[in-house]
Structure formats: structure tokens, C-alpha cells
Amino acid sequence: PPRSTLFPYTTLFRSHIERCLACGRCQSKKNQRPCVHEQTDDVAAIFRRMKESDLIIYATPVYVFAMSGLLKTFLERLYAKGVVSELTVSKKGLIFHKIAAAICSKPFVTLVCCDNLERETPQNVIDYFDTFSKFTDAPQVGLLVRNGGQLSGGGKDPMREEKVPKIYDVYEAYRQAGRELAQAGRIERATQQRANREIVPLPFFSLIKRLHFRPLKKKFVEKAREMMVTR
């Protein structure tokens, strides 16, 4: 049955996050010590919240074909929670080192957004979290990739939905994804497909756009311009 679910979130740009210095203090052979930033920034508190959570949603825009620098800086701080001198083998058969499983191995959802329509644009982020899952034994229970950000807008917009009805269905799919996470702890494949669908109202757009044929791409650009609502 449905239950009340809390979704606390952390906005990284509002948090104080220092970068890993690769100083090696946390991996000292004599005495593994806390990160040098342990008492001076917000990372330890964020790790505690992650440890207490049932699952984690890693959400990021695509910046220059990768996740945001802030998210990458934060994830690099996981180094201090592992023991690199103790080798292990992941469930996928990959050699790695001892990790803080209570943080790193939580089930997670990857949520990526970008303005560009090409499938290559978010691929580095998708690949990163796929690799993360394999090495850390963290089940990826959902992958939501929303391209065409300038077309779909940043929230409910009746004008956009009237112009492009697919947008309404996409937002409904995201709401359904939230319900499924709360009730079942994972997003159904069909829901992911609805949420990730192309919103450009052209037949077979997702298939045809893979063809790197410039005249055809120019036609797509013209159609995309028609969809945009002047702010």
C-alpha cells in the first residue's frame, strides 16, 4: 500500500564542498585518518544523510558533455571513505578496493537533463554511473534522461503543453516514476521510456536523428525553433 515518503535533497551549489587534495592522509598505512576537510565543509553531513537514506537520486545537468563539476568534486570525496590498500572483487567480477558500502552501494537513480537533442550529449554521464554501479555494487534502479530542456521548459507550462502535447505525457511519466520509487523502490522500464521519450513532434525522430545528415538535421532545428515559446 502507498506510504508517506520523505525526499530530502541537497543542492550542491548551496553546500560548502572542498575538492580532494590527493594528499593521502585518509589512506595512511600507519593510521587511516579522516579527510583533512572532515571538520571544515559539508561533505561529512551529506554522507551521513546518504547513509540514512533508502536510495539516492544523482541529478545533474550536462555541462560540456559531462556531469556538473560540483557533483564530480563531491563524488571524488568518496575516496576518503574507502581503503585503497584492501582489494576486493565486485559482484560484477571487477577488481576494486574496499569501499564504504553503507554510502556507495545504495540503490540509486540517475537523473540527467540537457538542452541538446543528440543522444551523444548525455552519454558520458550515463556511462559514468553505469560504471559506478558495477564497481560499487550499487543497483541502478532508474535512468531518467531529459533532453530538449529549452523545448520542454522548467516545469508545468500550459502554453508549451498545448503546443506540444507530448510534454504533458512526459511530466506525467516523471510523477509516475516518483510514485514507483516510493512504493517499489525502482522505476519500471515502461515508465522510464515514457519519461525519456523524444518530444519533437516528428515521426521516427529518435531513429532518424541518428543519421548524421546535415540537411535533415537543419529541418529538425527549424521544427525545434517552432516549438519554442518566446519568454
Language-model-detected regions and their locations in the chain:
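Short, flexible, glycine/charge-rich loop motifs used to bind or transfer phosphoryl groups or to couple energy/partner
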Residues: P1-R3, A45-F47, H97-I99, Q192-Q193, ...
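Helix-loop-strand module that forms the ligand-binding subsite of alpha/beta enzymes
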Residues: L12, V36-F135, K218, E222
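N-terminal beta-loop-helix "entrance" segment that forms/cooperates
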Residues: F13-R33, L151-P158
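Short, small-residue-biased leader/transition segments that mark boundaries at the very start
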Residues: P1-L12
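Positions that flank functional sites
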Residues: S15, F65, G148
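Structured loop/turn residues at beta-strand edges in well-structured enzyme cores
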Residues: T5, E18-L21, K51, I103, ...
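Glycine-rich phosphate/pyrophosphate-binding loop and the adjoining helix
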Residues: R119-E120, I126, D130-T230
